[in-house]
């Protein structure tokens, strides 16, 4: 299976915007792409503003909202915690079983995690365990601001300790008038982590299909991305 697992150094770093943009970019280059975001918290998967809806719209997949996101919870918390509040526990086997049912429906997949790679998804597993099981290279979405060097370095080193392949890092959310830290962080992160920067993307005032696709086309290194995916 070709594709990527998109994770982040934190929550609210723009994983879904990047994931959906990558899916649209691959689609525009004639790739048969599907999307999978197994967990969603705090919003209905069918809501037009949900991560699931954006992923579905941008990828143009025929997969249903339930196919894309089989496990959804009401509380805006880590999936394991949100599930416990509802008396629900999702096992690793359930996540992988659902993946097995949809993975053959597309040539490649963009899979999006929940928060960072250490977020608990169930009683005895984290996002990192799902990444390892799916065997997809990671794309790490990181903030551009002060503090991101440490967060990104720790994410990379933990991933390496788990034997997880890392395709690259995307620095997301650069402001219109970047401070000195925003200007220098990408180069420092690439040097310290030894992982390629796939792109440095701006903060979007409005998230639409058009603005997201325009952003990734202008700011993501497509040739490097394709090379990391082996196409």
Swiss-Prot record:
<dbReference type="InterPro" id="IPR027417">
    <property type="entry name" value="P-loop_NTPase"/>
</dbReference>
<keyword id="KW-0067">ATP-binding</keyword>
<feature type="binding site">
    <location>
        <begin position="12"/>
        <end position="17"/>
    </location>
    <ligand>
        <name>ATP</name>
    </ligand>
</feature>
<dbReference type="Pfam" id="PF13500">
    <property type="entry name" value="AAA_26"/>
</dbReference>
<dbReference type="InterPro" id="IPR004472">
    <property type="entry name" value="DTB_synth_BioD"/>
</dbReference>
<comment type="similarity">
    <text>Belongs to the dethiobiotin synthetase family.</text>
</comment>
<feature type="active site">
    <location>
        <position position="37"/>
    </location>
</feature>
<feature type="binding site">
    <location>
        <begin position="112"/>
        <end position="115"/>
    </location>
    <ligand>
        <name>ATP</name>
    </ligand>
</feature>
<keyword id="KW-0963">Cytoplasm</keyword>
<feature type="binding site">
    <location>
        <position position="41"/>
    </location>
    <ligand>
        <name>substrate</name>
    </ligand>
</feature>
<feature type="binding site">
    <location>
        <position position="51"/>
    </location>
    <ligand>
        <name>ATP</name>
    </ligand>
</feature>
<dbReference type="GO" id="GO:0005524">
    <property type="term" value="F:ATP binding"/>
</dbReference>
<dbReference type="GO" id="GO:0000287">
    <property type="term" value="F:magnesium ion binding"/>
</dbReference>
<keyword id="KW-0479">Metal-binding</keyword>
<feature type="binding site">
    <location>
        <position position="51"/>
    </location>
    <ligand>
        <name>Mg(2+)</name>
    </ligand>
</feature>
<protein>
    <recommendedName>
        <fullName>ATP-dependent dethiobiotin synthetase BioD</fullName>
        <ecNumber>6.3.3.3</ecNumber>
    </recommendedName>
</protein>
<keyword id="KW-0460">Magnesium</keyword>
<dbReference type="GO" id="GO:0004141">
    <property type="term" value="F:dethiobiotin synthase activity"/>
</dbReference>
<comment type="function">
    <text>Catalyzes a mechanistically unusual reaction, the ATP-dependent insertion of CO2 between the N7 and N8 nitrogen atoms of 7,8-diaminopelargonic acid (DAPA, also called 7,8-diammoniononanoate) to form a ureido ring.</text>
</comment>
<keyword id="KW-0436">Ligase</keyword>
<feature type="binding site">
    <location>
        <position position="112"/>
    </location>
    <ligand>
        <name>Mg(2+)</name>
    </ligand>
</feature>
<comment type="pathway">
    <text>Cofactor biosynthesis; biotin biosynthesis; biotin from 7,8-diaminononanoate: step 1/2.</text>
</comment>
<feature type="binding site">
    <location>
        <begin position="202"/>
        <end position="204"/>
    </location>
    <ligand>
        <name>ATP</name>
    </ligand>
</feature>
<keyword id="KW-0093">Biotin biosynthesis</keyword>
<comment type="subunit">
    <text>Homodimer.</text>
</comment>
<keyword id="KW-0547">Nucleotide-binding</keyword>
<dbReference type="GO" id="GO:0005829">
    <property type="term" value="C:cytosol"/>
</dbReference>
<feature type="binding site">
    <location>
        <position position="16"/>
    </location>
    <ligand>
        <name>Mg(2+)</name>
    </ligand>
</feature>
<dbReference type="GO" id="GO:0009102">
    <property type="term" value="P:biotin biosynthetic process"/>
</dbReference>
């Amino acid at each position: 299976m070709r594709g990527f697992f998109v994770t982040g150094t934190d929550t609210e770093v723009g994983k879904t915007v990047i994931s959906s943009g990558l899916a649209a970019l691959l689609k525009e280059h004639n790739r048969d792409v599907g999307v999978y975001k197994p967990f969603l918290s705090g919003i209905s998967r069918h809501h037009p503003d949900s991560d699931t809806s954006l992923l579905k719209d941008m990828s143009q997949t025929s997969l249903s909202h339930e196919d894309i996101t089989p496990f959804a919870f009401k509380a805006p918390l880590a999936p394991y915690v949100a599930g416990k509040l509802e008396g629900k526990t999702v096992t690793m086997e359930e996540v992988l079983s659902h993946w097995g049912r949809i993975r053959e429906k597309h040539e490649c997949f963009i899979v999006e995690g929940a928060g960072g790679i250490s977020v608990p998804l169930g009683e005895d597993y984290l996002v990192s365990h799902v990444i390892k099981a799916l065997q997809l290279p990671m794309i790490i979405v990181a903030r551009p601001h002060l503090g991101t060097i440490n967060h990104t370095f720790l994410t990379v080193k933990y991933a390496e300790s788990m034997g997880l392949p890392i395709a690259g890092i995307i620095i997301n959310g650069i402001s219109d008038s970047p401070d000195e830290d925003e200007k220098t962080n990408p180069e420092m992160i690439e040097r310290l982590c030894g992982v390629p920067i796939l792109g440095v993307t701006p903060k979007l005032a409005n998230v639409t299909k058009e603005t997201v696709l325009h952003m990734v086309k202008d700011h993501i290194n497509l040739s490097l991305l394709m090379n990391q995916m082996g196409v």
